[in-house]
């Protein structure tokens, strides 16, 4: 019985951890979008006027088309997005 309880707690902890990470990704992308002042660079690309935000901004823009997928409960997609988020940092 103790083993089952321990396994259940591990599963709950992992699920909560994934949800928190998704919330972090969502918050970072939303904050970036709101605080970024977009400008068009000489080469025609759109960049963020705030240098610290530029890397995250690029990440968020690349995620924009599938951000809703990142919020779904498909652990493969979540894991992929979380890894991309950590690499973009």
From Swiss-Prot:
PTM comment, free text: Contains 4 disulfide bonds.
Signal peptide: 1-22
Tissue distribution of the protein: Expressed by the venom duct.
Protein's UniProt keywords contain Protease: no
Keywords for the protein's UniProt record, in alphabetical order: Cleavage on pair of basic residues, Disulfide bond, Secreted, Signal, Toxin
Compartment(s) of residence: Secreted
Gene Ontology CC: extracellular region
Coiled-coil positions: none
Keyword Cell membrane attributed: no
An example molecular function term from Gene Ontology annotations: toxin activity
Domain topic, free-text comment: The cysteine framework is XXII (C-C-C-C-C-C-C-C).
Family: Belongs to the teretoxin C (TC) superfamily.
Record protein name field: Teretoxin Tan22.12
């Amino acid at each position: 019985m103790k083993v089952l309880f321990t396994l259940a707690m591990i599963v709950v902890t992992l699920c909560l951890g994934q949800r928190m990470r998704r919330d972090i990704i969502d918050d970072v992308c939303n904050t970036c979008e709101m605080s970024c002042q977009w400008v068009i660079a000489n080469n025609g690309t759109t960049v963020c006027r705030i240098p610290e935000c530029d890397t995250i901004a690029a990440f968020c823009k690349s995620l924009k088309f599938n951000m809703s997928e990142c919020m779904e409960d498909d652990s493969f997609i979540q894991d992929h997005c979380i890894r991309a988020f950590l690499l973009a940092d």
